[in-house]
């Protein structure tokens, strides 16, 4: 491949292919109802968002990937380090694996990856591309997603893309859940998931 796919669906499908060994994405269904959230679209360039849920409920097992372009990757990485120092217990070694948060060092120049256990996601920066992988209910260790997060940053990137997004078919059983609410950019009645960028702003 000489470059990333040019369309939203091409990039979503490539992300799904990268994640397949970890989550069996092929056994899940797409669930986001926008190619990105309004908040991410307003504040970040070339933002892209894709999410999948288990076929039975749509929320028992979910995987969400968020990508956007940042102005300065190294500055963004330093911002993540500052956030960890502020929000994690004092004295915690943030460069050694632990349940709260840590940076996996020794990456290629301009690449950074953080395992944020207390937030439930992996965050990677590749050049000026910012990637988050957020699994819920999958029992996959976040540390195992570091390499694929970097891989997505290298292969999918965060350049401009053609928006050929189409609404997914929402299964009837998802709509008939006893509990739930509507979250911007997601299918209705799907508890337990919100846009990571929106959450960060809130």
From Swiss-Prot:
This is Protein Rv0740. The lineage of its organism: Bacteria, Bacillati, Actinomycetota, Actinomycetes, Mycobacteriales.
């Amino acid at each position: 491949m000489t470059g990333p796919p040019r369309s939203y669906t091409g990039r979503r499908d490539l992300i799904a292919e990268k994640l397949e060994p970890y989550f069996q994405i092929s056994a899940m269904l797409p669930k986001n109802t926008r190619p990105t959230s309004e908040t991410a679209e307003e504040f970040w360039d070339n933002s892209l968002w894709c999410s999948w849920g288990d076929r039975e409920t749509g929320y028992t097992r979910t995987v969400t990937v968020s990508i956007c372009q940042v102005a300065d990757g190294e500055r963004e990485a330093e911002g993540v380090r500052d956030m960890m120092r502020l929000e994690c217990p004092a004295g915690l070694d943030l460069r050694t694996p632990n349940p709260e948060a840590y940076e996996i060092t020794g990456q290629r120049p301009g690449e950074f990856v953080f395992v944020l256990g207390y937030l439930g996601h992996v965050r990677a920066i590749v050049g000026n591309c910012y990637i988050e992988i957020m699994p819920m209910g999958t029992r996959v260790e976040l540390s195992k997603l570091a390499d694929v997060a970097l891989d997505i940053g290298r292969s999918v990137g965060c350049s401009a893309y053609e928006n050929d997004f189409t609404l997914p078919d929402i299964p009837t059983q998802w709509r008939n859940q006893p509990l739930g609410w509507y979250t911007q950019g997601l299918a209705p009645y799907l508890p337990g998931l919100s846009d990571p960028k929106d959450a960060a702003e809130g």
